[in-house]
Amino acid sequence: MVEEPTIAVYDSQSHEYHRAFQVFLDHTDQKLKAQKWLTDLIDRLPSRRVFIDAGAGNGKVTAWFTERFGRTITIEPNASLRSELKRDCPAAEVVPERILDAKVGAAGDLILCSHVFYYIDASEWLPNLQRLVSWLSSSGVLVLVVQNHDTDCMRMLEHFFGRRFLLASFARQFQKGCGESYQVRVETVPAQVETADFASAYTIAEFMLNLLPISDPPARGALEEYVGAHFARPQGSFRFSCDQDFVQIWRRG
């Protein structure tokens, strides 16, 4: 009996991950909308001395904002991503550690943690969040960026693995648990993936499923059927939502 092919499984250090991520970037407005939202926030900051990018990846997002701050500190444990980070952000200080192990030695006016919590086990969300807010300056803001739980992508994740990411709800629980020492605000910004061909839509869907560790990958045919049934448009293109939550946390005055 021939086994049915399964979806590809890869980690964030692999060539396959980077290739699929680029296909995603080429077919979404998510990053441009994030850039605009963050630019508007930075314009309103009372101080722009220190920018901390926790989980900076390859530095593409970091590079948008380094010139807006007097000092930029990046945290990135992935060696392959760090090489790109150093190339694209030569003026930034690079801390090659996980968030929980990092020592930054500065208070951040903006601390950004963008699409990182997917890769952190839920049991470690609280200590990671506590570490991040401990780096805030008195007037600083922490921004956690994560895909909204009610997008087409998250519904697909729940369909195949029974899970969605509920970071915004977790942040509100954190606020209550801290005796209201922190203010939390969540803003959802719509975003879409749109492709003209099935192959790109499938690659992006497969990439989204790889946000979680996959011990028992679903059949490739099952994902192909899902993409066709849920994301296909009448004119032959494919569209699915990937709205972002911008979770803002700052100290109460």
Residue locations for each model-derived region?
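Short alpha-helix
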Residues: R163-G179
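Class I SAM-dependent methyltransferase SAM/SAH-binding core
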Residues: G57-D101
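A conserved beta-strand element that flanks and buttresses the S-adenosyl-L-methionine
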Residues: L112
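Conserved Class I S-adenosyl-L-methionine
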Residues: V184-G253
